[in-house]
Amino acid sequence: MAAGQNGHEEWVGSAYLFVESSLDKVVLSDAYAHPQQKVAVYRALQAALAESGGSPDVLQMLKIHRSDPQLIVQLRFCGRQPCGRFLRAYREGALRAALQRSLAAALAQHSVPLQLELRAGAERLDALLADEERCLSCILAQQPDRLRDEELAELEDALRNLKCGSGARGGDGEVASAPLQPPVPSLSEVKPPPPPPPAQTFLFQGQPVVNRPLSLKDQQTFARSVGLKWRKVGRSLQRGCRALRDPALDSLAYEYEREGLYEQAFQLLRRFVQAEGRRATLQRLVEALEENELTSLAEDLLGLTDPNGGLA
């Protein structure tokens, strides 16, 4: 890979930052879904990451996933030194402090205590923070699997419009003195961003898809086609489902070894549905499949393939 202007392009890696509020009254996934809070939450994340890791040239958000009650931020690192700086800020608590400060201001709370987790692939980096070299190796091994999400570009445009609108009213002391106050008054004065898909839909390959709880047919389709990758999908689902966290997957593999891969995969989703109830949705499964390069299985679940193997 060719070096960029600052030599950062030679070193590129990816990680996932899990952010969850410890306050029952603050659910970050809900706040990010709210049209009038979304820009403020994005701005808070962006500001905290810039403070702890550097400019978007070296630390970029690729996508923000909602996984009730968490937000999962996919990060792209360009450059070993900026990544090391981010890891030190994470280890020393500077990133947590910056996020808590920014999110409290964005959501009009006195404080928003946070629980954070950092993962690179299957590695939970929180347990490895004392070994920075190993953390860097884990992040480097996870090459970004996507370009920046279009939704984040739209939020960036909305934020830029918001800043321009505030600058044009620089004589208004109330606006200028509280740039991180709840965005409702400011957003009403500027052109809002394009509305997100309704809460009951999600985007798949750029198209809105109706979200719903997983059905028995979904579980059967998944179990029939996923094969050996059921454990990888389980690793993705376990981030937002405590019932699937270690050693649950190993237990499933052992308990249903005689029955084979179909039963192991079926029982994985059965446990997911039992634990999450109506929150065990099609969207969460499809995102886990996409993360593990199982797009064709996602298309089967969504009914987007015809019997001849082409797109419906």
Curated annotation (Swiss-Prot):
Which GO biological process annotations does it have?
apoptotic process; canonical NF-kappaB signal transduction; cellular response to tumor necrosis factor; extrinsic apoptotic signaling pathway; extrinsic apoptotic signaling pathway via death domain receptors; positive regulation of apoptotic process; positive regulation of canonical NF-kappaB signal transduction; positive regulation of cell migration
The tissues in which it is expressed are: Found in all examined tissues.
Q: What residue spans carry the region label Disordered?
A: 170-195
Q: What is the effect of changing residue 245 to A?
A: Strongly reduced GlcNAcylation by S.typhimurium Ssek1
Task: Cite the residue spans of the region called Interaction with KRT14 and KRT18.
Answer: 222-289
Cellular component aspect of the GO annotation: cytoplasm; cytoplasmic side of plasma membrane; cytoskeleton; cytosol; death-inducing signaling complex; nucleus; plasma membrane; receptor complex
Chain positions carrying an annotated carbohydrate: 235, 245
The record's keywords, sorted A to Z, are: Apoptosis, Cytoplasm, Cytoskeleton, Glycoprotein, Nucleus
Would you indicate the residue range of the signal peptide?
none
Query: Residues in domain Death?
Result: 179-289
Disulfide pairings:
none
**UniProt biased composition (Pro residues):** 180-195
Q: Report whether Nucleus shows up as a keyword of the record.
A: yes
**Keyword DNA repair on entry:** no
- PROSITE patterns linked: DEATH_DOMAIN
Q: What does the record give under GO molecular function?
A: death domain binding; identical protein binding; kinase binding; protein-macromolecule adaptor activity; signaling adaptor activity; transmembrane receptor protein tyrosine kinase adaptor activity
| Subunit structure and binding partners | Stimulation of TNF-alpha receptor TNFRSF1A leads to the formation of two distinct signaling complexes. Plasma membrane-bound complex I is composed of TNFRSF1A, TRADD, RIPK1, TRAF2 and BIRC2/c-IAP1 or BIRC3 which interacts with CHUCK/IKK-alpha, IKBKB/IKK-beta and IKBKG/IKK-gamma promoting cell survival. Subsequently, TRADD, RIPK1 and TRAF2 dissociate from TNFRSF1A and form cytoplasmic complex II with FADD and caspase CASP8 promoting cell apoptosis. Within complex I, interacts with TNFRSF1A/TNFR1, TRAF2 and kinase RIPK1.
What is known about what this protein does?
Adapter molecule for TNFRSF1A/TNFR1 that specifically associates with the cytoplasmic domain of activated TNFRSF1A/TNFR1 mediating its interaction with FADD. Overexpression of TRADD leads to two major TNF-induced responses, apoptosis and activation of NF-kappa-B. The nuclear form acts as a tumor suppressor by preventing ubiquitination and degradation of isoform p19ARF/ARF of CDKN2A by TRIP12: acts by interacting with TRIP12, leading to disrupt interaction between TRIP12 and isoform p19ARF/ARF of CDKN2A.
UniProt-recorded name of the protein: Tumor necrosis factor receptor type 1-associated DEATH domain protein
Species lineage, top-down? Eukaryota, Metazoa, Chordata, Craniata, Vertebrata
Q: Name the gene for this chain.
A: TRADD
